[in-house]
Amino acid sequence: KMAAAANAASEAVGILKVPFLSVMMGGAESGIDTRDTKRQGTKYNGSGCLIHGLSVVADSFVAIDTLLRERPEDADRLVDALRTNFEHDQKMRQYLLGCKKFGNNIETADLEAREIADRVSDIVSSKKNYLGNPFRSDFATPSTHLLYGYWVGATPDGRKSRDMLGYGVDPLY
């Protein structure tokens, strides 16, 4: 569904030509606009898919693994804390915030983020755009991490409900 919606949006946007961008993308040689949805002709004629919250997901997986290894009896407590946005369990939140985090030169957390990014990129690139080219993962979230964070509940990394997601591939903590 995502690929079909993105392709429809690309065709609609294709009505608006972008000659200056097209020249920089090889359109001067081919004479084809980069937004032309019927013909390939520019060097980079792909479609992107914005990926949000990489650090939140990676940090959450690390926090869950840590909790289950160190304090398996608190698994249900974690679920309750997330459901209530940590309102009644600040100690659990502080524990989660103290777990290893992506972007702090900690191998386990950084490898978790890399594995997630690789898997997501593989899934996204398996989809084709309107010209048959693969979609590409785009981890540069232009301020949409603020908007999307508003709609995401509390997460196991200690992030509270409606707080922003991490920007692009930047660490949140």
Q: Where does each model-flagged region fall?
A:
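Acidic, glycine-enriched catalytic cores built around paired aspartates
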Residues: 1-173
